[in-house]
């Protein structure tokens, strides 16, 4: 009987290890984060190369306690694709159709990141309604059904010429063949502001996911204010809210996160639902960019706003995308 129990237990452990996204032994989650280095992405060798960095880590769950262990190695990735001398400013990480993608918020290019660290351009997203000459400022991405959805900050502003710029109110729907459709999301973004009772203010979005299990949208805003958007003050504020919206945005809830932020200017840049949590537990990155200084924090919260792991700083650079991986063994190892 004891032998039979051991065999069954061993089989269960194997099944956990082989399940995509499942933690080893139910306690360790592998993840990777990707950097937006801004102007530091430009190669100092002046060889038309642009660089980002991927780092990997482990989220360790013991009972109802969580901790994070980051690995020291920097996985450098390069591209020659750029827009006006800027490139590889990568803002999100997403698995779609069993492939890993990342998004350049300067060129609008959606890259596939291969396991050998090659960045392969897949599609280029034109700004706004898709009939623009510049690239889409991609800041968030998720999957819904068979499609990939890519969005921007969700704010409009008056440019230097006095013209209203609403390009960031559009989102992109991409199918598995790379066909892109531009969708006007002004109404959806306005409904979120109304639900937060700041109809005349602004909400800066960088962390959005569709929950297939709950059939709802989940937003962790990076910045929010009851005042209109102002470039002079936006660096000084973050946002400590969770927004949950029904599929058609007819029902929207704004939830206050109960823990205090290390820095009030830090805001959410990316998150993923933890496997086997019924989309109730979120592993999230927060970033800060203020006075030419940057930092990245990581935290675990639940969908009710309860903090399960307080924020901890994991890097002095700005990492704006996170993804959960089955394994990081051999991840981004260049072939010799």
From Swiss-Prot:
GO terms for molecular function: apyrase activity; ATP binding; calcium ion binding; calcium-dependent ATPase activity; GDP phosphatase activity; nucleoside diphosphate phosphatase activity; toxin activity; UDP phosphatase activity. Its cofactor is Ca(2+). Pfam families: Apyrase. Its EC number is 3.6.1.5. Belongs to the apyrase family. It is found in: Secreted. Keywords: ATP-binding, Calcium, Glycoprotein, Hemostasis impairing toxin, Hydrolase, Immunity, Metal-binding, Nucleotide-binding, Platelet aggregation inhibiting toxin, Secreted, Signal, Toxin. Its main location: secreted. Salivary gland (at protein level). It catalyses: a ribonucleoside 5'-triphosphate + 2 H2O = a ribonucleoside 5'-phosphate + 2 phosphate + 2 H(+). GO terms for biological process: immune system process; proteoglycan biosynthetic process. The lineage of its organism: Eukaryota, Metazoa, Ecdysozoa, Arthropoda, Hexapoda. The keyword Hydrolase applies. Glycans are attached at residue 209. Facilitates hematophagy by inhibiting ADP-dependent platelet aggregation in the host. Cleaves adenosine triphosphate (ATP) and adenosine diphosphate (ADP) to adenosine monophosphate (AMP) and inorganic phosphate in calcium-dependent manner. Triggers proliferation of host peripheral blood mononuclear cells (PBMCs) and IFN-gamma/IFNG production. Residues 1-21 form the signal peptide. It comes from the Eukaryota. It comes from Phlebotomus papatasi. Gene3D superfamilies: Apyrase. This is Apyrase.
């Amino acid at each position: 009987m004891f032998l039979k129990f051991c065999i069954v237990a061993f089989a269960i452990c194997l099944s956990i290890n082989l399940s995509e996204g499942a933690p080893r032994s139910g306690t360790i989650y592998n993840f990777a984060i990707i950097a937006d280095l801004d102007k530091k992405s430009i190669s100092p060798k002046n060889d038309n190369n642009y660089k980002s960095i991927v780092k990997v880590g482990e989220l360790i769950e013991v009972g109802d306690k969580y901790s994070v262990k980051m690995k020291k190695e920097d996985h450098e990735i390069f591209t020659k694709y750029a827009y006006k001398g800027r490139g590889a400013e990568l803002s999100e990480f997403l698995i779609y159709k069993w492939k890993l993608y990342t998004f350049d918020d300067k060129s609008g290019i959606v890259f596939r990141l291969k396991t050998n660290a090659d960045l392969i351009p897949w599609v280029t997203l034109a700004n706004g309604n898709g009939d623009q000459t510049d690239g889409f400022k991609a800041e968030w991405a998720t999957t819904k059904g068979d499609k990939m959805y890519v969005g921007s900050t969700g704010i409009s502003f008056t440019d230097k010429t006095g013209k209203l710029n609403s390009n960031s109110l559009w989102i992109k729907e991409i199918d598995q063949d790379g066909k892109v459709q531009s969708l006007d999301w002004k109404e959806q973004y306005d409904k979120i502001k109304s639900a937060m009772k700041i109809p005349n203010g602004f909400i800066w979005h960088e962390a959005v996911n569709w929950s297939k299990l709950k059939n709802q949208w989940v937003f962790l805003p990076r910045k929010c204010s009851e005042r209109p958007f102002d470039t002079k003050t936006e660096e000084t504020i973050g946002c400590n809210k969770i927004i949950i919206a029904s599929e058609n945005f007819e029902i929207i809830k704004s939830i206050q996160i109960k823990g205090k932020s290390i820095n009030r200017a830090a805001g959410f840049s990316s998150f993923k639902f933890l496997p086997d949590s019924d989309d109730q537990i979120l592993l999230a990155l927060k970033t800060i960019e203020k006075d030419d200084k940057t930092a990245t924090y990581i935290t675990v919260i639940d969908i009710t706003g309860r903090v399960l792991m307080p924020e901890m700083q994991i890097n002095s650079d700005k990492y704006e995308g996170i993804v959960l991986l089955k394994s990081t063994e051999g991840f981004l190892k260049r072939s010799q």
